[in-house]
Amino acid sequence: MPTLGITDFWTYVLGVVFVILLPGPNSLFVLATSAQRGVATGYRAACGVFLGDAVLMLLSALGVASLLKAEPMLFIGLKYLGAAYLFYLGVGMLRGAWRKLRNPEATAAQAEQVDVHQPFRKALLLSLSNPKAILFFISFFIQFVDPGYAYPGLSFLVLAVILELVSALYLSFLIFTGVRLAAWFRRRQRLAAGATSGVGALFVGFGVKLATATLS
């Protein structure tokens, strides 16, 4: 029996868990931020991800997915902007890793001076930078909404809240994992720089993937 217009509820929850667990730029950014700057800053980044995902899900519900399909040039423009931002973040991490190798003490001092709101803004932009996420949300959610239910908006809202709750649990795990990794990496500066380089390279790869994404 559908509940609040939701069909196959537990199938949806299981699907959300698998989707959230897939490695992506949002989760990697939160992990890297918490490893570099601690729990509080990690949660600021996580809040940026939550807000960004909420905006994308709202846009999906408002029909922006149909607009993107109807206007391919809009989709192309947005995806290239998103890819450029992923490149920017990736190159920044690669440069930071190089600086850390050359002068670990100076890098640590610079990290202390970073604007505390910067991780939130970066994570928010990162979450909003993928127009294909709008298409994903609408195509994923619609499978679990009963077409005969009188209030489909309520069904969509419940599905969105469940996704955000699962995301919050997973990102919390990553934040505390990142803090533990930071303590370990502090004694191994070369390894820390290598890990940062790896994450930066992944972000560049995510940028390439987004730049070559299609509507289909």
Swiss-Prot record:
GO terms for molecular function: L-leucine transmembrane transporter activity. InterPro entries: Homoserine/Threonine_efflux, LeuE-type. One of its GO terms (biological process) is L-leucine transport. It is a multi-pass membrane protein. Its main location: membrane. It is found in: Cell membrane. The chain crosses the membrane at residues 12-32, 48-68, 74-94, 134-154, 156-176, 191-211. Keywords: Cell membrane, Membrane, Transmembrane, Transmembrane helix. The keyword Protein biosynthesis does not apply. GO terms for cellular component: plasma membrane. Pfam families: LysE (PF01810). PANTHER family: ARGININE EXPORTER PROTEIN ARGO, LEUCINE EFFLUX PROTEIN. Belongs to the Rht family. This is Uncharacterized membrane protein PA4757. The lineage of its organism: Bacteria, Pseudomonadati, Pseudomonadota, Gammaproteobacteria, Pseudomonadales.
